Amino acid sequence: MARICFLNPFGTDSYDELIDSTLRPALHGSTEIEIRHLSHAPANIDYYAPKHLVETEIMTAAIEAERDGFDAFVIGCCYDPALTQCRELVSIPVIGPLEASVSLSRLFGHSFAVVTDHRKAVPELRDRIRLYGLESNCRAVDAIDWYVTDMVLDPIAVAKDTYIKVQDVMRTTGAETVIIGCTIVSACYELAALRGDTEMASLSVVNPNVMAVKLAEMFADLNATGQYRISRTAYYQQHASHDVAEAAEILELLTEHPATRSMTQV
């Protein structure tokens, strides 16, 4: 049985139920998942300044998840904020939804496009796709121009706008599959599909929440069998291998206060 911590990296519980209800149908029967959110962070990361503040809290949340006995940690935002830092800090697998989705996109189609929430996110996602080495397979990054705080007010309207944009992007770019490049947009889309919208369910749309959690399940299994052999020689080298005292100071700074609350604590 895998225990997975899925972090909504927002200083609010507004999205927890939406994520939980749209993720659970995709889980293995033996998988246990806990949805958490941040307790000392901005309510959204639509802009880069709050995103930077949130990244420190995400690092603390990853440490908490490992200490709480989780087998994997998912950062529930397609910016993949603090992904590299968390992998440096903890020994359990850490999964970012965008990295998971673009890495698996070839299994869904020869080329992909990304549809995200608003235009502010477009260049950031382009940069991350280039960082992940998959720019040549990406036909486009586009947006539906919704802000995250508005989405929970009318998730079905978000889903409908996403469906229209996905069709348009497929038609104009030739992309065979589309990754929804926002975890909340994707949850809105999945909610509509789960409620019986067969047209939405019929499109080749990649859900980053599901991709991240399924990858977390797999990597938790790999770790349990001794096969999660992450390299610590350079990119993910841990601070303590260089200076134990410095690493301890950083850890103390990161754990001065609890970073997260779970759905059961709200």
Could you describe each region identified by the protein language model?
Residues L83-I95, Y189-V210:
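Short acidic, glycine/proline-enriched helix-loop-strand junctions
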Residues I129-T183, E190-A193:
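Active-site rim beta-loop-alpha module in soluble metabolic enzymes
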Residues W146, A201-T225:
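Short, flexible loop segments at boundaries between secondary-structure elements
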Residues P97-V102, H118-K120, N209-A212:
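Short, acidic/turn-prone active-site loops that include or flank metal/cofactor-
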Residues M59-L104, F108:
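Glycine/small-residue-rich loop that forms an oxyanion/phosphate-binding "nest" at active or ligand-binding sites
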Residues Y47-E64, V158-K165:
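Glycine-rich, highly charged phosphate/nucleotide-binding loops
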Residues L7, R67-C77, A175-T183:
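Periplasmic-binding protein-like
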Residues M1-T56, D117-D154, E252-T264:
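N-terminal glycine-rich anion-binding loop in soluble enzyme alpha/beta folds
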